[in-house]
Amino acid sequence: MSWLDKLLPPKIKQTDPKSRKGIPEGLWVKCPSCEAVLYRNDVDANLHVCPKCDHHMRIGARERLDALLDPEGRYEIGQEIVPVDSLKFKDSRKYPDRLKEAMDETGETDAMVVMGGAIHTLPVVAACFEFSFMGGSMGSVVGERFARGAQNALEQHVPFICFTASGGARMQESLLSLMQMAKTTAMLTKLSEAKLPFISVLTDPTMGGVSASFAFLGDVVIAEPKALIGFAGPRVIEQTVREKLPEGFQRAEFLLKTGAIDMIVDRRKMRDEIAQLLALLQRQPADALA
């Protein structure tokens, strides 16, 4: 027994590390904005919005779709499509190794989830990026799932909604990923010709090839509060132009002020706001919504 053990009262003893295995981890989360320490269950119940400062944290694709769509009648689109290493690409690591790691961490097979369903009984098709999967980068699978979602909306004659959260085109797929920019915008042209609404919701972050292709092509373009939206990141721009950027540059509020987006909507009100917009765009009475 050490001299310190002799001084400590009997009740103040270091617990056995083996006994700590039953203690659950991740019960608390720190807000990246106000740095408040929050109970994770409260954050989850608040759709990952800080109850102290209203900061919108990042949220998973399926959790977002769960909050958007009615619980009944959902169906997934394009889940059978999986990525392949057509170019045998290798940077610091092999592409298949990166894919496997992302799949294990997220439980998804790529960076987009597409579902058909309804919002307050109004039928829709909704696509959502999974940012945790390789930064939400757009590759062949993301482009194909987006296209199939839009095609399904055409066939069902229902509106199409997309929530973006992406760093841009997927480097590991080179030109195949860049081709998705044209592919996705071409599908939106078909939706426009069919007079079907497309609502684009820009979340943090929406950058690169996604922002440069379909993200701003919505009949209504919505953003979440303080979302980072642009092509190149602010640090890259500052290093290039060698000037300090204005406060809030490339944030949702800046884009609203300059007319690049139509509205900013709190995540907790998103479902109701989109339902109201769909009723308006389809000339349905708003008070008829369930």
From Swiss-Prot:
Pfam families: Carboxyl_trans (PF01039), Zn_ribbon_ACC (PF17848). The keyword Cell inner membrane does not apply. The keyword Cell cycle does not apply. Binds 1 zinc ion per subunit. PROSITE patterns: COA_CT_NTER. One of its GO terms (molecular function) is zinc ion binding. Transmembrane segments: none annotated. Its cofactor is Zn(2+). Pathway: Lipid metabolism; malonyl-CoA biosynthesis; malonyl-CoA from acetyl-CoA: step 1/1. Its EC number is 2.1.3.15. One of its GO terms (biological process) is fatty acid biosynthetic process. Keywords: ATP-binding, Cytoplasm, Fatty acid biosynthesis, Fatty acid metabolism, Lipid biosynthesis, Lipid metabolism, Metal-binding, Nucleotide-binding, Transferase, Zinc, Zinc-finger. A zinc finger (C4-type) spans 31-53. One of its GO terms (cellular component) is acetate CoA-transferase complex. Zn(2+) binds at C31, C34, C50, C53. Gene3D superfamilies: 2-enoyl-CoA Hydratase, Chain A, domain 1. InterPro entries: AcCoA_carboxyl_beta (IPR034733), Acetyl_CoA_COase_Trfase_b_su (IPR000438), ClpP/crotonase-like_dom_sf (IPR029045), COA_CT_N (IPR011762), Znf-ACC (IPR041010). It catalyses: N(6)-carboxybiotinyl-L-lysyl-[protein] + acetyl-CoA = N(6)-biotinyl-L-lysyl-[protein] + malonyl-CoA. Residues 27-290 form the CoA carboxyltransferase N-terminal domain. It is found in: Cytoplasm. Acetyl-CoA carboxylase is a heterohexamer composed of biotin carboxyl carrier protein (AccB), biotin carboxylase (AccC) and two subunits each of ACCase subunit alpha (AccA) and ACCase subunit beta (AccD). Belongs to the AccD/PCCB family. PANTHER family: ACETYL-COENZYME A CARBOXYLASE CARBOXYL TRANSFERASE SUBUNIT BETA, CHLOROPLASTIC (PTHR42995:SF5). This is Acetyl-coenzyme A carboxylase carboxyl transferase subunit beta. It comes from Burkholderia multivorans (strain ATCC 17616 / 249). The lineage of its organism: Bacteria, Pseudomonadati, Pseudomonadota, Betaproteobacteria, Burkholderiales. The gene is accD.
